[in-house]
C-alpha cells in the first residue's frame, strides 16, 4: 500500500472515542439497526482501535436496544489468527481487497516496500477461511486487466471466495484508467 505522499498516522483510542461520541450524539436513537464499516487505508493497521470501537459502540447502542452491525474491508496482509478469531466471535463480515490470482495481485497490489503480496494474502485468507467459510473478494479492475475478468473470478473462486465483487478503478492515470 501507498501513503499518497501523506504522513502515516494511527488514530489513538482517545481520538476514536471522541469520534464515536460525536457520532453517537447525533445518532437517531429510535433506529433499530446501525451499520459500522471499517475500511479505507488499511484498517488492520489499528487492530486495537477496531476492537475498542466495536466494544464501545456496542455499549452505547445497547442503552437504546439498537443492533449494531459491523463489517470490514481489508487487504489481509496484517490479518493474523488472533484478529481472525475476533472477527468471527463478533460476527463481523470480511471483504478482502484482492485483484486476482498471483500474477495480477502481485502486479497491482505490492506491499509498501515493493515486495509481492499474494503469498501473504493467500495464507491469511486461508487461515480465516478455516474458521469462517464465506468470504467476499473485492477486485479493483484496471484497464490492463479488463480482458481477464473471467480468469480473475475463476482464480478467486478457486481460492475459496464465495462472492466476488468488482469496482472500476477511479483514477486519472492513463495506464490504469478504463477508457473503453
Predicted regions and their residues:
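A C-terminal junction/extension of Radical SAM enzymes
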Residues: 175-180
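Canonical Radical SAM [4Fe-4S] cluster-binding loop centered on the CxxxCxxC motif
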Residues: 1-14
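Radical SAM/AdoMet-radical enzyme domain recognition
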Residues: 13-37, 46-171
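A short, flexible beta-alpha/helix-coil linker loop
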Residues: 2-5, 103, 171-174
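Short acidic donor-binding/metal-coordinating loop in glycosyltransferase active sites
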Residues: 40-41
